[in-house]
Amino acid sequence: MMGKCHCRDCQHISGGPFVPFVIVPTEAFRLMRGHLQYHFTESLKGGKHKRGFCANCGSRLTGAESDTPSPIVGLVAGSLDDPSWFRPQLDIFTSDAQPWDQMDPEIPKYEKYSPG
């Protein structure tokens, strides 16, 4: 799944109106070099959110719920070696979207998390 998260947390982290993300199975994710450093914050679901950052440059690379081992991980699309294939399929947390953010009217919108 590929989408854009418009929550205030993602706005703060990115310095922009949303974070473009790609959801992949955790076992399919492999860091090609270096290692991740993690930062934990309160999740919008009430638990903890685990963000992975490049230990060398500080770029945000991953995000996942951390209260339990997660079968999926969110990758920040702009951090991929080739993000040109990214095609958003949905917008989430549109209730937090900025009024000047021009969302694609052709993809589904969810006020909070997407169902499922």
Regions found by a protein language model. Give the residues of each.
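A short Gly-Trp-Pro
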Residues: 1-116
